[in-house]
Amino acid sequence: TAYRRQRQMCIRDRDEHHTIEDTAIVLGQCFSEALGGKKGIGRYGFALPMDEARAEVLLDLGGRSWLEWNAAFSREYVGDFPTEMTKHFFASFCQGAKCNLHVAAKGENTHHVIEAIFKAFARSLRMAVRQEAGGRIPSTKGRMD
């Protein structure tokens, strides 16, 4: 399973770059596997949060990998987390999940901006995987990879 592959990768890769990258790829693969043929899902999702920070995440689970990124951080680290890895996490997730993701965020507090991005992403995923009436594949092609 994807989880077992991830566990083996993390045993070998001890630095944060590879651990975050591998985790995101496998998480994306798990979502893709769990959705199967994607029959009946909403396919799209988006959200906007929090405090002085704002994040917008647009998601399409249509089977093509793409990340559009419009967020910058004023700090290099939040605690022990390298902020540059935020974008890389989402690029890796897109690769594993075969999804389109557009992220736009701004704010003064780097911690709040990153938190807003992850919360918006979670809400977007919840919207996109929600079952809709009709149970059809949400594509004019009749299938999604």
Please state what every model-predicted region is.
Residues 29, 36, 51-52, 67, ...:
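Non-catalytic, interaction-prone regions of core transcription and DNA-replication machinery
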Residues 1-7, 11:
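Single conserved hydrophobic/aromatic residue that forms the stacking wall/gate
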Residues 38-97:
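Intrinsic, low-complexity N-terminal interaction/targeting segments
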Residues 20-42:
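Ordered, amphipathic secondary-structure segments that act as subunit-interaction surfaces
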Residues 47-49, 108-112, 135-145:
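Short, highly charged C-terminal tails/helix-capping segments
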